[in-house]
């Protein structure tokens, strides 16, 4: 057997973020005051481990690239804002996301279906949505001192912002195209939009109540009814609890001005088209929350190896032994895959799921934003006599096919053998202490090409 040759990881051509110090040790490169050791919180829901807190999500992914946003490719940065509209309305100073009228109507239809499934009749559903999605006066907000040359946001009867291109342009802040957040300062002035308590009447939740008209329907509905849960309420941390209390999310919808003709709009330039549009402030009837989903191996590594994650099930914290047993019940191969995950993480690699390329793990240097995966890993658990039931018994044909797939994507195929003593029983595997007796052997599989080997011999 020839000795494997180490190949340097292949760096990505474009890197769009800086490397942060990994958990749990804060390095000197982090700016700001030195923070104390932090315990993150997660929940086990439907055999999945999820993190809801916004700050916890950012820290876990940014410092070690743990987990994945359920609505994003990797980093949880989902937003409903339209970047094209944000650039078009760059003169508007707002933290609210700007979306198209079509996207807003999709959310109205989702909310309509949600209310129908709750058993409401069509007239009640229509009344709820009509009151809830009426145009709103712009909430009060303090003007920033660094931009005194611009006019404050005006609130008119039509509750809209007219497009201003040539003069009186309104300033813009980066929040318009970024993550959509609730408006700051709500409830601080008497003439601002007021947020209700945990349960509010339709009159309190309806825009008409702010204009001096009280809705006639006295029915009391929870805010979760008015704002259906597309994801989960972010309630795992104090900051996320504050996000839950802010029951409504406000959006700006780009709508046509009255009297604008489709033929004229199609032939008009962008500047003229913007003059025929307006921004209307409305409530978002169907909010979608993104959370960070951790694999079972990532969750256990954070809880067991780093000790920086507390996992709850039905509001009860789970011990390390209970986590080991619960994850094994959910995923029978968890013990084997976690031992390999723990080993490679301890070596400084960032392991990710390798299902895309038919393997158990992919190994990244630093993280996926910086390097391509170097190795595709197959994991097997054997005894010290190299005997045992294989998780994936390969034939020469299937092994050659997997090797060819890994080679075509510039990755090396690694066979990771976890060797346990022959005296280790099933009872010994019931706790993570069994890992102290496990040995690891790595075998890199490479395809032998006769023509290439012949040319190498001729050169020698």
Swiss-Prot record:
Q: Which GO terms describe its biological process?
A: mRNA processing; tRNA splicing, via endonucleolytic cleavage and ligation
Nucleus as a keyword of this entry, yes or no, is yes
What is catalysed by this protein? pretRNA = a 3'-half-tRNA molecule with a 5'-OH end + a 5'-half-tRNA molecule with a 2',3'-cyclic phosphate end + an intron with a 2',3'-cyclic phosphate and a 5'-hydroxyl terminus
Report the subcellular localization.
Answer: Nucleus; Nucleus, Nucleolus
GO CC, sorted alphabetically, is: centrosome; cytosol; nucleolus; nucleoplasm; tRNA-intron endonuclease complex
User: Which residues lie within the region annotated Disordered?
Assistant: 143-215
- Give the EC number(s) under which this enzyme is classified: 4.6.1.16
Subcellular location, principal: nucleus
User: Which GO MF term does the entry hold, naming one?
Assistant: tRNA-intron endonuclease activity
Q: Which SUPFAM superfamilies would you find in this protein's record?
A: tRNA-intron endonuclease catalytic domain-like (SSF53032)
* Residues the record marks as active site: 364, 372, 411
Q: Where is the composition biased (Basic and acidic residues)?
A: 159-170
What Gene3D superfamilies does the record tag this protein with?
Answer: 3.40.1350.10
Alphabetical keyword list:
Lyase, mRNA processing, Nucleus, Phosphoprotein, tRNA processing
- For the protein in the UniProt heading, the enzyme class is lyase
Respond yes or no to whether keyword Cell membrane is given for this record. no
Positions where Phosphoserine occurs in the chain: 403, 406, 410
Instruction: Quote the subunit structure annotation.
Output: tRNA splicing endonuclease is a heterotetramer composed of TSEN2, TSEN15, TSEN34/LENG5 and TSEN54. tRNA splicing endonuclease complex also contains proteins of the pre-mRNA 3'-end processing machinery such as CLP1, CPSF1, CPSF4 and CSTF2.
Family of this protein: Belongs to the tRNA-intron endonuclease family.
Please explain the role this protein plays, according to its UniProt record. Answer: Constitutes one of the two catalytic subunit of the tRNA-splicing endonuclease complex, a complex responsible for identification and cleavage of the splice sites in pre-tRNA. It cleaves pre-tRNA at the 5'- and 3'-splice sites to release the intron. The products are an intron and two tRNA half-molecules bearing 2',3'-cyclic phosphate and 5'-OH termini. There are no conserved sequences at the splice sites, but the intron is invariably located at the same site in the gene, placing the splice sites an invariant distance from the constant structural features of the tRNA body.
Q: What is this protein called?
A: tRNA-splicing endonuclease subunit Sen2
Q: Which gene encodes it?
A: Tsen2
């Amino acid at each position: 057997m020839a000795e494997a040759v180490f190949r340097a990881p292949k760096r990505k051509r474009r890197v769009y973020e800086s490397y942060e110090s990994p958990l749990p040790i804060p390095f000197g490169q982090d700016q700001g005051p030195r923070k104390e050791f932090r315990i993150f919180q997660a929940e086990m829901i439907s055999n999945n481990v999820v993190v809801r807190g916004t700050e916890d999500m950012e820290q876990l992914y940014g410092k070690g690239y743990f987990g994945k946003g359920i609505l994003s490719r990797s980093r949880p940065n989902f937003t409903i804002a339209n970047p094209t509209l944000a650039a078009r309305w760059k003169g508007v100073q707002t933290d609210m996301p700007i979306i198209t009228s079509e996207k807003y109507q999709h959310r109205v239809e989702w909310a309509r279906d949600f209310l129908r499934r709750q058993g409401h009749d069509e007239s009640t559903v229509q009344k709820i949505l009509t009151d809830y999605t009426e145009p709103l006066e712009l909430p009060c907000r303090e003007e920033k001192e660094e931009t005194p040359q611009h006019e404050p946001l005006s609130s008119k009867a039509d509750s809209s912002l007219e497009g201003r291109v040539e003069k009186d342009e309104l300033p813009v802040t980066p929040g318009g195209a970024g993550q959509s957040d609730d408006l700051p300062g709500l409830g601080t002035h008497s003439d601002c939009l007021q947020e209700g308590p945990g349960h509010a009447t339709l009159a309190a939740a309806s825009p008409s109540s702010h204009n001096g008209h009280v809705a006639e329907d006295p029915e009391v509905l929870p805010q979760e009814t008015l704002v259906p849960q597309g994801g989960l309420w972010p309630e795992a941390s104090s900051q996320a609890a504050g996000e839950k209390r802010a029951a409504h999310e406000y959006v700006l919808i780009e709508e046509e001005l009255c009297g604008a003709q489709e033929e004229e709009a199609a032939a008009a330039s962008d500047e003229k088209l913007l003059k025929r549009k307006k921004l209307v402030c409305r409530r978002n009837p169907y909010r979608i929350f993104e959370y960070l989903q951790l694999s079972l191996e990532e969750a256990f590594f954070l809880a067991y190896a780093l000790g920086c994650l507390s996992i709850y099930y039905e509001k009860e914290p789970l011990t390390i032994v209970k986590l080991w047993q619960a994850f094994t019940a959910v995923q029978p191969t968890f013990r084997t895959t976690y031992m390999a995950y723990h080993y490679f993480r301890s070596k400084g690699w960032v392991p990710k799921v390798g299902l895309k390329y038919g393997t158990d793990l992919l190994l990244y240097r630093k993280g996926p934003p910086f390097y391509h995966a170097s190795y595709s890993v197959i994991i097997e658990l054997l005894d010290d006599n190299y005997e045992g039931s294989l998780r994936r018994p390969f034939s020469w044909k299937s092994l050659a096919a997997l090797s060819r797939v890994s080679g075509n994507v510039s990755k090396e195929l690694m066979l990771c053998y976890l060797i346990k003593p022959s005296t280790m029983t099933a009872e010994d595997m019931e706790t993570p202490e069994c890992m102290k007796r496990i040995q690891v052997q790595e075998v890199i599989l490479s395809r032998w090409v006769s023509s290439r080997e012949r040319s190498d011999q001729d050169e020698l």
